[in-house]
Amino acid sequence: MKKFVKMLVSSALVAAMAFGMCACNGNGGATQAPATEAPATTEGATEAPADTTASGELIKVGIINNDPNESGYRTANDKDMKETFTKENGYEASFFYSLKNEDQIAAAQKFIQDEVDYLLISAAGTSGWDGVLEQAKKAGIKVILFDRTIDASEDLYEASIVSDMAKEGQQAVDWLASQGLSEYKVLHIQGVMGSSAQIGRSGALDAKVKAEANWTIVKQQTAEWSEETAQQIVQAVIDSGEKFNVIYAENDNMAKGAVAALDKANISHGVGKDVIIIGFDCNSWALKELKAGNWNYDGQCNPFQAKYIDDIIKNGAKQKVVIMEEKGFDAKTITDDDVAKYGI
């Protein structure tokens, strides 16, 4: 399989270099998959040769991901990858997990030495990947990004199957603005700094606060996706006596930790209460909290990218970028069907 891939890589790279990766915002005439099937929009069409298992050899893939214990989203994402990249489906898969960019890059170098056919990467951080991707290119190894974008030339990877994190953040901020508060005092709990999820979700809020005189950030601090750390951050703000009426947490786990601190201090939260709660990912348990009125808004982040990667490997990259279709949910309008259909 390795020799076969090396024969194909030249034409693949020529095709990939012919097209710039499209911006994550906007649909550009893209099609959408049914909502029950991890929906996606696609942009920037480009053809690439398909891989095959006709020789009887397994396709060797090195999969670099964030820690599955990071969040419910990541657990679902890892499960999806493991259920797809199996021997029965034609793959020999090796997995590496870390929340640190430098560890992930070192793992990529090791996978290159192991002569994998494909590197599948969900990057912990957006920067620093050019060198190792150049190494992969020289070795004839194809790279597919999933879940998160990186700052690297598009000719260094075959395709990108990602969430539009900036759009997720903008949808949440637009919803918050629509609530018509006279004053917004926001406690902002961030994810791992430098990740595309943090950059996108933080960026929308930062821009709104800069533009509006009645929007204020009371506290902005990373909890690195941790429920426990988020609880500690909120508890410290409560203890300081600083007033806030919005918690903008960049994932569900951190929102859960924030709510635990509010409950401990007997501060009401949710629909019609003292503090608005915003989370991201749409874990099933979080959507149930939303439906119960304990939270106010949850932004979807779709973790089911594996089938798109499998299709690209076996049938060729028909587009450079696949953007997962995602929406936000309001406690006042979410239904039991939404919880069942979109909860992860």
Regions found by a protein language model. Give the residues of each.
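Short, low-complexity disordered leader/linker segments with a strong preference
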Residues: 1-60, 134-141, 340-344
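Flexible loop/hinge segments that line or gate small-molecule binding clefts
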Residues: 127-167, 282-291
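Hinge/cleft segment of the Venus flytrap/periplasmic-binding protein
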Residues: 51, 57-59, 189, 193-197, ...
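Hydrophobic alpha-helical
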Residues: 105, 112-138, 205, 219, ...
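Short beta-strand elements at the ligand-binding edges of bilobed clamshell
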Residues: 95-97, 152-175, 188-190, 220, ...
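Extracytoplasmic "Venus flytrap"
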Residues: 60-88, 94-110, 122-127, 190-200, ...
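Hydrophobic alpha-helical segments within soluble ligand-binding/sensing domains
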Residues: 57, 61, 104, 160-185, ...
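Short, solvent-exposed amphipathic alpha-helices that sit
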Residues: 72-91, 168-172, 196-215, 229, ...
